[in-house]
Amino acid sequence: MSSRSPRPPPRRCRRRLPRPSCCCCCCRRSHLNEDTGRFVLLAALIGLYLVAGATVFSALESPGEAEARARWGATLRNFSAAHGVAEPELRAFLRHYEAALAAGVRADALRPRWDFPGAFYFVGTVVSTIGFGMTTPATVGGKAFLIAYGLFGCAGTILFFNLFLERIISLLAFIMRACRERQLRRSGLLPATFRRGSALSEADSLAGWKPSVYHVLLILGLFAVLLACCASAMYTSVEGWDYVDSLYFCFVTFSTIGFGDLVSSQHAAYRNQGLYRLGNFLFILLGVCCIYSLFNVISILIKQVLNWMLRKLSCRCCTRCCPAPGAPLSRRNAITPGSRLRRRLAALGTDPAARDSDAEGRRLSGELISMRDLTASNKVSLALLQKQLSETANGYPRSVCVNTRQNGFSGGVGALGIMNNRLAETSASR
């Protein structure tokens, strides 16, 4: 007898079906560019927000507009009949009045529009992007100069707002960190000899502590409300407006919407005029800076909602395409049953269990290597640079962690870049 092992049966060439992967192509494409998905989702939500706002304002303001048109038509007809003036001639006269109104002419005595104080008020509304519209350049030279002046003025003012945002966030973080240290010291978690910047502070529970965006939002919101209430009290007593109209003017001005239906400091003379104009300037300056900072903090919350919605959509897509977590993954061939494959391996003298364990080890090793490479090259250079600069300026530890997770805030520009790693919700470790 021959000592040779029995020759295995000839292997049939069978066409293998594609093996279903855990993450299908649609899931992979959904993760390619999360920023694009966030942008598209935000654009869709803004569109829905505009539709909802237009519906509400149309329902609230449309009846009043119809009544005002009816009253104005009746008044015009009565005046034309009472004074014997033809209605077309009366309308032509009203068009001349509208042109004079656009040029700054008013029926009541108002302050000059283009003296130095009036021009200073105008350029202030230009560079702050408020743009009330009560004063506009009428000459060609004035319009041409406004284009160049507004280009650099608006850019410089936006930079000023961003620097103000950086300072106010740093100040709030410093105050809240001091309150946190005091609370920990009272509870006995910090020794009485604790000093910021020491080695103990870096190893203790305050290492890398950052204020929550909700606390910053609450503080900025309370300060904005207090500022608007104080300014409204001044406008009510000096301008003679209702308190609700004064609050409305404060929001329209501080948010740089600037409708122009209500404009402060437009009368020819005021009691304590110099003091009032100074107070008006300071209130508008502080209000615009505060509301700008508040808007940027609110944008962080909106971005968190967008990230949550994207995660939900991604998880829903993955649950349709991928097996449930914890389910055993079958490594059988789609054509050859497992029993036949085991018999063939036994005929070849190969242990199926050892073969599976070896393949499993190689697969896990490959996954670990790929995950390690992915973590090392996960766009951490810019985020780490911003984190180091921010933590150096705020006294945070300089420990560098390369295992940063993309939360949608790292590597931002503008106001989001300024608040990067300064709040708990914009930290790269979240």
Curated annotation (Swiss-Prot):
GO biological process: potassium ion transmembrane transport
GO molecular function: identical protein binding; metal ion binding; outward rectifier potassium channel activity; potassium channel activity; potassium ion leak channel activity; protein heterodimerization activity
Binding-site list for K(+) 4: 129, 256
Domain of life per record: Eukaryota
Ranges for region Selectivity filter 1: 129-134
Matching InterPro entries: 2pore_dom_K_chnl, 2pore_dom_K_chnl_THIK, K_chnl_dom
Entry keyword annotation includes Disulfide bond: no
This protein's record includes keyword Metal-binding: yes
Principal subcellular localisation of the protein: membrane
Selectivity filter 2: annotated segments: 256-261
Sugar attachment sites: 78
Keywords for the protein's UniProt record, in alphabetical order: Cell membrane, Endoplasmic reticulum, Glycoprotein, Ion channel, Ion transport, Membrane, Metal-binding, Potassium, Potassium channel, Potassium transport, Transmembrane, Transmembrane helix, Transport, Voltage-gated channel
Residues given in the record as K(+) 1 binding sites: 129-130, 256-257
Tissue spec. comment: Highly expressed in most brain regions. Also expressed in other tissues such as lung, kidney, liver, stomach and spleen.
Parts of the chain that traverse the membrane: 39-59, 145-165, 213-233, 282-302
Ligand binding (K(+) 2): 130-131, 257-258
Span list, region ER retention/retrieval signal: 11-16
Cellular compartments per GO CC: endoplasmic reticulum membrane; monoatomic ion channel complex; plasma membrane
Recorded catalytic activity of this chain's protein: K(+)(in) = K(+)(out)
Segments dipping into the membrane without crossing: 114-134, 243-263
Cytoplasmic side: 1-38, 166-212, 303-430
Positions that bind K(+) 3: 131, 258-259
Entry comment, domain topic: Each subunit contributes two pore-forming domains 1 and 2 which assemble to form a single pore with M2 and M4 transmembrane helices lining the central cavity and M1 and M3 facing the lipid bilayer. The transmembrane helices are bridged by the selectivity filters 1 and 2 that coordinate the permeant ions. Up to four ions can simultaneously occupy the selectivity filter and at least two elementary charges must translocate across the filter to convert it into the open conformation.
Subunit structure: Homodimer. Heterodimer with KCNK13.
Role played: K(+) channel subunit that may homo- and heterodimerize to form functional channels with distinct regulatory and gating properties. Can heterodimerize with KCNK13 subunit to conduct K(+) outward rectifying currents at the plasma membrane. The homodimers are mainly retained in the endoplasmic reticulum compartment and may be targeted to the cell surface upon phosphorylation or other activation signals yet to be elucidated.
Stated name of the protein: Potassium channel subfamily K member 12
Source organism (scientific name): Rattus norvegicus (Rat)
Source species taxonomy: Eukaryota, Metazoa, Chordata, Craniata, Vertebrata
